[in-house]
Amino acid sequence: MSVDVDCVVIGAGVVGLAIARALAQSGREVLVAEATEAIGTGTSSRNSEVIHAGIYYPAGSLKARLCVRGKHLLYSYCAERGVPYKRLGKLIVATTTEQAAQLEGIAQRARANGVDDLQFISGEDAMRLEPALRCTAALSSPSTGIVDSHALMLSFQGDAENAGAQCVFHTPLVSGRVRPEGGFELQFGGDDAMTLSCNVLINSAGLHAPALARRIDGLPASNIPKDYLCKGSYFTLSGRAPFSRLIYPVPQHAGLGVHLTLDLGGQAKFGPDTEWVETEDYTLDPARADVFYEAVRSYWPALPDDALAPGYTGIRPKISGPHEPAADFVIAGPAAHGVPGLVNLFGIESPGLTSSLALAEETLARLNG
């Protein structure tokens, strides 16, 4: 059976690039096809850039296992490759007695996930660490950090290309089919429309992964989950923040609450909130600032008026809807759908960035398993 290229990875976000890197470094011929003009233009560049510890996810879930594994891989990779990062630590803060009671459950879940470095601290001790903070109790997570996600993606791209991979842009997948003799035939649009055949197809298209899977003739529709769009807005802080750590409220449904994160330059941003939407619209409504002021002042009461400026928005690629429990990552290989050579990645929301290197490992294992 002749093919034009051995492996095609759809999507040049952080996970797609990590997978392309792993495939290329294993000796395979790899083409990365990205619909837009550059790497990381979707969810990968519209997030909090946090290296998560692995605290919140159900024990035994892919999110829990791959976040913890990915965190260790990512810190080692960034240190080795000079990708900017900081292990700042995080405080999960309770501002009511009811929330304080929830901290023990969070700590128990973290321990079940292999995260054993959380520390309970009193409100007084938390406020000694961060004098601008107001809380009744907190959990300290010393292994939480931040990373320059674009530098990370550039490094993954460089690794992949150094191992022989090729990245092409403005190349959206229009349709595809499973070939009877094995492999895939793919039709791409864009400026240079083309048809390619390949042995291996990795669908790492983020928000568009379910829609892309539906374009592949021969893949059972029952193996493609319904997708939902959950928008999150961010506001940036004018001036310097009086915090040296990330500050997270006790999590609420569908997200981790309006948290305070810092970038590598020390600039603070707040978000994301949770807004279920029907279309992929990245417009930020400045009026949402009112809700942000209220949320942030629950733990930083001295937040000045007019201190928040509209930042950006992101959309979580969810495969569970409003009022449903959060879904786990789905990495659907041949064992799941019966199509040799195909892996679909669905619902790769947070902690996808943290988990990227571990997701690549898992994808190759499911491809070959």
From Swiss-Prot:
Its EC number is 1.1.99.2. InterPro entries: FAD-dep_OxRdtase, FAD/NAD-bd_sf. GO terms for molecular function: (S)-2-hydroxy-acid oxidase activity; 2-hydroxyglutarate dehydrogenase activity. Its cofactor is FAD. It catalyses: (S)-2-hydroxyglutarate + A = 2-oxoglutarate + AH2. It holds the Pfam family DAO. Belongs to the L2HGDH family. Catalyzes the dehydrogenation of L-2-hydroxyglutarate (L2HG or(S)-2-hydroxyglutarate) to 2-oxoglutarate (alpha-ketoglutarate). Also displays some oxidase activity in vitro on L-2-hydroxyglutarate with O2 as the electron acceptor, but this activity is most likely not physiological. This is L-2-hydroxyglutarate dehydrogenase. It comes from Achromobacter aegrifaciens.
